[in-house]
A protein has these predicted regions:
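Hydrophobic transmembrane alpha-helical segments in integral membrane proteins
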Residues: 1-13
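Hydrophobic membrane-targeting alpha-helices
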Residues: 16, 57, 155-156
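A generic, lipid-embedded transmembrane alpha helix
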Residues: 44-60
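Short, hydrophobic transmembrane alpha-helix segments
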Residues: 1, 58-65
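Cytosolic-biased juxtamembrane loops and peripheral soluble domains of multi-pass membrane proteins
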Residues: 22-41, 64-168
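N-terminal signal-anchor/start-transfer transmembrane helix
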Residues: 10-23
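Physicochemical signature of membrane-embedded alpha-helices that form the seven-helix bundle of GPCRs
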Residues: 7-10, 48, 77, 144
Length: 168
C-alpha cells in the first residue's frame, strides 16, 4: 500500500506541475490570438487520463503491486516517458498546452523529438500509462486505460493534424 501511495503522490505532483505549465502557455497563446478547434476531445481526456492513473494505482493498492523486478521495469518506462514528454514540452516551448491551440502564422516545430516523430507527447502518454500499469501490476485497469487513452489520442491527433493543416 505504501508503494501505491508513493506512486500516486509522484504522479499527482508531476500532473499538477504539467497543468501549471499548460495554463501559463494557454494564457499567452489565447492572448496572442491562437485558435482552438471545436472538435477536440480535451474535456474527455481531462477526465480519462487522470482517472486511468487513479484506477491503476487503486488496483495495485488493493491487490498488491508488482514484484521488485517488474516495478523497476515499469518505473524505467515511466521515467523514460516523462523525459520524452519534457523534451517535447521544451521543444514546443510556449506552444505546449493540454489543449489544441494553434498560434497565428506558426511554423512547424522540427527540433527535439519532433525531428523524428510528429507527436512525441502522445508516445510519452502511452509510456506513462504502461509504466504505472507495470509498477502497480494493474492488469485490468492498465489494459483498459491504455486502450481508452489510445483511442482518445488517435482522435486528438486527427484534430491536431487538421488544425495544423497536416491531413494524411
Amino acid at each position: 500500500m505504501q508503494v501505491a501511495l508513493l506512486t500516486f503522490l509522484v504522479v499527482v505532483v508531476v500532473m499538477v506541475f504539467e497543468a501549471i505549465i499548460s495554463r501559463r502557455h494557454e494564457k499567452v497563446l489565447r492572448d496572442t490570438g491562437a485558435i482552438e478547434p471545436a472538435e477536440d476531445v480535451y474535456v474527455l481526456m481531462q477526465a480519462v487520463y487522470p482517472l486511468s492513473f487513479v484506477g491503476m494505482i487503486t488496483e495495485g493498492g488493493l491487490f498488491g503491486v508488482a514484484s521488485y523486478s517488474w516495478w523497476m521495469v515499469g518505473a524505467a518506462i515511466f521515467l523514460t516517458a516523462k523525459a520524452l514528454k519534457f523534451w517535447a514540452i521544451a521543444s514546443l516551448g510556449i506552444r505546449w498546452t493540454f489543449r489544441v491551440l494553434v498560434p497565428i502564422n506558426a511554423s512547424f516545430v522540427q527540433s527535439g523529438p519532433y525531428r523524428w516523430v510528429l507527436h512525441p507527447n502522445y508516445i510519452a502518454v502511452i509510456g506513462e500509462l504502461l509504466g504505472v500499469a507495470l509498477m502497480m501490476k494493474a492488469l485490468v485497469t492498465g489494459v483498459i486505460s491504455i486502450i481508452g487513452c489510445g483511442l482518445l489520442i488517435a482522435k486528438r491527433i486527427s484534430v491536431e493534424n487538421r488544425a495544423l493543416g497536416r491531413i494524411r
